[in-house]
Amino acid sequence: MEKDIYYLVGQNIKKQRKLKGLTQLQLANKTFFSYEFIRKIESKSACRNTFSLATLSKIASALDIDIRLLFEPLDDDKTA
């Protein structure tokens, strides 16, 4: 279950970033996180990584979204 939540959040970050028209590098610059860190969070292997609520808050703020959007269930379709 714990691994699933990291995957869910990572995919929702990717979805919201794309909806905002941002690249991973642009999001990294807005959050002051590294591009590699953003890439890992969004990757399918993100379930191996952990990140804090403070990190999610910073990302949600950079995306100008409510942090709760990062915990929404994924659509049946891929979140390309």
For every predicted segment, state its role.
Residues 17, 28, 60:
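The alpha-helix within a helix-turn-helix
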Residues 69-80:
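Short, charged recognition helix plus adjacent turn
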Residues 22-41:
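Short alpha-helical DNA-recognition segment
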Residues 45-61:
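Short, basic-rich loop-to-helix N-cap that marks the start of a DNA-contacting helix
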Residues 14, 25, 57:
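Residues within the helices of the helix-turn-helix
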Residues 11, 21-22, 51-54:
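Residue-level signal for the short linker/turn that defines the boundary of a DNA-recognition helix
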Residues 1-19:
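A short, Lys/Arg-rich alpha-helix, primarily the initiator
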